[in-house]
Swiss-Prot record:
This is Cytochrome c. GO terms for biological process: mitochondrial electron transport, cytochrome c to oxygen; mitochondrial electron transport, ubiquinol to cytochrome c. InterPro entries: Cyt_c-like_dom (IPR009056), Cyt_c-like_dom_sf (IPR036909), Cyt_c_1A/1B (IPR002327). Gene3D superfamilies: Cytochrome c-like domain. Binds 1 heme c group covalently per subunit. Belongs to the cytochrome c family. It comes from Dictyostelium discoideum (Social amoeba). Keywords: Electron transport, Heme, Iron, Metal-binding, Mitochondrion, Respiratory chain, Transport. GO terms for cellular component: mitochondrial intermembrane space. Its main location: mitochondrion.
Amino acid sequence: MSDIIARGNVENGDKLFKARCAQCHTTANGAPNKQGPNLYGLFFPKSRSFPGYAYSDPNKNTGKFCIMWGEQTLFDYLENPKKYIPKTKMAFAGFKSEQDRADVVAYLEQSTK
């Protein structure tokens, strides 16, 4: 178990996800994409690999933006998505609190399996 997952609070992550992320993302197997992709199976696919979702050009490019999602990359991304991937379609400004990010990552690690 990573340090991020260990310090994350899944219940608070669920609340944060529902309040800040669920309007654009789903997490259940087979759920449709919304404004953002369904995050089921999130950890360790390349960032452009969710079927049926039209990714922004920076997400589709090879090299730097071909991200392997894990606890640390997601934790870093959620601080400021537009800084992490310039020109991403994701409108969310990010979670500035490290604890909030750890909580959401812990929730997603559990809910997207």
